[in-house]
């Protein structure tokens, strides 16, 4: 894939503007001033292929990354594929797969028991698992906040989140992570919805190349993170 296949319309300012969500520790680490991780590595690789400067904007939650894309403040972002987001962005094929899990202090609760009357589930507002549970939960109540852990500590029955940070929190607080995972979260590159499908196709080709060349696997390993790589 050459830069001429990607550049038209992708970088209207002459630089590649990318939003990085530091709220997902599997995909991004570090600080706003010095972010690291597979999303940052991928953004740098894309800018290098295009031969343009990279401008990174960091946020603390997926909903803020989504807003930056929809409002046209950035050209590229890294988000989980969810139907609710497709009205505002277009997605490539997924480059990484992670999982959404429940944790609870109720040792009698199972994954199948979570969706019942009287159960309150704590989520981070606007996250992939919030969107997924919003369209699938029929009986339980979803409680939203900036941090799911804070909502859980406010009295919710179940904490929902990405497996890795939820597991750490569960270990620190004597909770049980319920198996199996309730969601397979497919992470992809996203662009604003008004970008042409040809642009998405070109980015998808890059994603597939980065997966096939072990670029993504090597980046995850450097960051000390474990995730599945779809199609590999």
Over which residues does each language-model region extend?
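Flexible hinge/capping segments at coil-to-helix
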Residues: 92-95, 104-121, 198-201
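A ligand-binding cleft/hinge motif common to bilobed small-molecule-binding domains
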Residues: 63, 79-88, 132-135, 149-183
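Ligand-binding clefts/hinges and TM-proximal coupling segments of bilobed small-molecule sensing domains
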Residues: 1-8, 12, 131-146, 208-232
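Short loop->beta-strand "edge-of-pocket" segments that line small-molecule binding or catalytic clefts
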Residues: 15-22, 26-28, 36, 112-129, ...
């Amino acid at each position: 894939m050459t830069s001429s296949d990607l550049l038209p319309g992708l970088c209207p300012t002459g630089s590649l503007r990318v939003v990085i969500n530091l709220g997902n520790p599997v995909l991004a680490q570090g600080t706003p001033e010095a972010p690291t991780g597979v999303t940052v590595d991928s953004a740098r690789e894309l800018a290098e292929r295009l031969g343009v400067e990279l401008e990174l904007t960091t946020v603390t939650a997926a909903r803020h990354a989504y807003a930056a894309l929809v409002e046209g403040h950035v050209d590229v972002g890294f988000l989980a594929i969810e139907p609710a987001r497709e009205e505002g962005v277009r997605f490539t094929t997924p480059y990484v797969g992670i999982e959404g899990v429940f944790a609870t202090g109720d040792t009698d609760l199972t994954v199948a028991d979570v969706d019942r009357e009287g159960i309150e589930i704590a989520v981070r507002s606007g996250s992939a698992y919030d969107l997924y549970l919003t369209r699938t939960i029929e009986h339980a109540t979803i409680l939203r906040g900036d941090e799911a852990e804070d909502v859980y500590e406010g009295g919710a029955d179940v904490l929902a989140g990405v497996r890795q940070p939820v597991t750490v929190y569960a270990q620190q607080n004597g909770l049980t992570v319920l198996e199996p995972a309730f969601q397979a979260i497919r992470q992809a590159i996203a662009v604003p919805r008004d970008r042409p499908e040809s642009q998405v196709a070109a980015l998808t080709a890059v994603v597939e190349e980065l997966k096939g060349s072990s670029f993504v696997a090597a980046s995850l390993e450097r960051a000390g993170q474990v995730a599945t790589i779809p199609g590999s």
